[in-house]
Amino acid sequence: MTRFRSALAPLAIALAGLTAVPQQAWAAPPKPVPSVAQQQQPPAAPKAACGPTVKATTTDARLTSLFTNYGNDNSRLDDWTGADGTYSVKLPNGKELWIFSDTFLGRVNTDGSRPPVVGEGGDTVFLNNSFAVERDGRLSTIHDGTAAAPTAVMPPRDQNHWYWAGDATVAGGLVEVTYQEYERYGTGAWDWRWHRNVVARFAPGRLNAPVSVTNLPSGHGVAWASAVLKDGGYTYVYGVEDLGSPKYMHVARVSGQSLLGTWEFLKADGTWSPNEADSARVMSGVANEYSVTKVGSGYVLITHDTTEVLSPNIVAYTSCSPFGPFTGKQHVYTTPETKGNIFTYNAHAHPEVAGNGLVISYNVNSFVNTDHYRDVTIYRPRFLDVTFQ
């Protein structure tokens, strides 16, 4: 669990406001967790005329219990017991692919705890990314390696690099998953940083390893992995420029369905440029992971509210366009888990599993690493059903 500790513990200190963050550590996007927000924000603009209004938010008991029951099932000891990230995409065969970043594999004790990770005296496996496939209400874990020695589906190039997952799409029968590569450059707690963006392509029948990995634009400090949306002949890719406080949305697009096409970037004047350097800050207040979804005739941005310090609030903005402006902040939900050492982060939608409205997930975590051993329920996604009017 060394990487999990080194990544989370320094961020926890910084987010709690106990110390200044070294400039080098924040030079590019860190692990997707909420950050100290801006101290002042301008008044919210009116909601877009074509954007829906949030009507009600309720717990999605089916999905929340699906992952709870699966995580507690000890019928296999090389499968999922908790993770964050929680993106999803519908596979061509109709199955649902759940995409995770940091992942615990192994068993759950009868008291609801998990053994420490391998290397800390236990047998819990810790990977930086994994998949789970849902079919007919049943889940199965996808990893590479073997049952005795699981490895990540998106393998690191060496022990000083690793990948965290972003949103995904399907093109030409293959699953295209965005990943952010991080690197360790020293021995100190702060000595790691974002390095680049890539897209990995997976065959639906062989999800344990990519068939190809291609570099994505990475030259200007934007993590192009926050959200993906197909709309009107384009595939829009949403990124975050994470300065700690604030975080800025950026928007790019590719003609057609594949992220391997030619990218163009939204400029400040609303036109598009082939140069990533022209990419404009669309708005602040987004998290590292968020979503943009078409609902009715408008577009809904779902995000944790990073205009507040360690906010438990999930909010929505609306637009008449997939690239904004997104206005009219609406409260969606206040996460009840947020208290003490526990925080929530990175809410986003799963439109392919929604019925009447949107399904939203969010992640739960703790600033105290041993909490993840003590209580397996902490490090698991929660799901919500949101209806609009």
What annotation goes with each model-predicted range?
Residues 1-29:
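Secretory targeting and sorting signals
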Residues 84-87, 149-169, 224-227, 288-291, ...:
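Beta-propeller and closely related beta-sheet repeat lectin domains
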Residues 223-231, 239-241:
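Long, low-complexity, proline- and polar/charged-enriched segments
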Residues 339-368:
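Short aromatic loop motif centered on NTY/YTY
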